[in-house]
């Protein structure tokens, strides 16, 4: 069972992502939903996530910074980036 954290500053998006993940209860469980990267980091040590689903632009800490932080704390964690932006430079930055 993969443990998933969702970080997105839009509540509707967080809720929709959570619903999508929960369609696979044998494989995934959502262990935390956060409206910003700071809250995700503050709660991550007790949640021990395997997967991060994050927006790129959020208050306090960007999704890219959040991924970088989690890669140090949880090196095997996988990340999924969601964004409404059409600027592909965010994707290139996230892949670095």
Show which residues each predicted segment covers.
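Non-catalytic signal-transmission and effector/linker regions of two-component phosphorelay proteins
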Residues: 1-3
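CheY-like receiver
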Residues: 41-96
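Short hydrophobic/Thr-rich beta-strand motif most characteristic of the beta2 strand and flanking loop
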Residues: 27-35, 43, 91
